């Protein structure tokens, strides 16, 4: 009996662990912007201004921002302002990261009771800036960081 209980618990833990990391590429068609998102997440909106995704564990929002005359040094102030405007509490210091096509920054915090990441990505040619918010529950920060580090843009032909 104890052996069956142990095997059942291991199967449940294994399923939860695999589910937490089950990511698949998804694209915002207006910009050819692709990133890894949780498998099965629903696209609520896919317009030129906004890309919204939703599941029982994640709410992901992407927006294209007016980037005219914006430089990489402007991103920290921009991100902090967006998080403050949305009432994000317990904000972490801003961290930067670098991708093949983007300069990126993020901060962690709480949106009401749920953990969240707020991020900005600027293309390395300084042509586009994207704002990303990911509100989530029942997952590991590493999954969210993996999503943020997976962004890429279709190369122009």
Where are these regions (language model features)?
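Sec-dependent N-terminal signal peptides
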Residues: 4-14
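Surface-exposed amphipathic alpha-helical segments
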Residues: 21, 32, 38-42, 83, ...
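Secretory pathway targeting signatures of secreted, lumenal, and periplasmic proteins
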Residues: 31-76, 110, 114
């Amino acid at each position: 009996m104890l052996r069956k209980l142990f095997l059942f618990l291991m199967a449940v833990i294994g399923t939860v662990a695999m589910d937490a990391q089950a990511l698949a590429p998804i694209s915002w068609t207006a910009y050819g912007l692709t990133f890894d998102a949780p498998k099965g997440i629903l696209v609520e909106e896919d317009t030129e201004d906004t890309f919204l995704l939703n599941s029982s564990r994640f709410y992901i929002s992407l927006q294209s921002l007016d980037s005219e005359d914006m430089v990489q040094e402007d991103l920290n102030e921009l991100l902090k302002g967006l998080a403050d405007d949305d009432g994000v509490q317990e904000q972490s210091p801003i961290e930067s990261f670098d991708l093949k096509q983007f300069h990126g920054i993020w901060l962690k915090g709480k949106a009401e009771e749920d953990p969240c990441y707020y991020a900005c990505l600027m293309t390395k040619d300084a042509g586009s800036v994207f704002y990303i918010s990911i509100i989530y529950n029942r997952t590991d920060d590493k999954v969210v960081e993996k999503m943020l580090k997976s962004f890429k843009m279709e190369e122009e032909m």
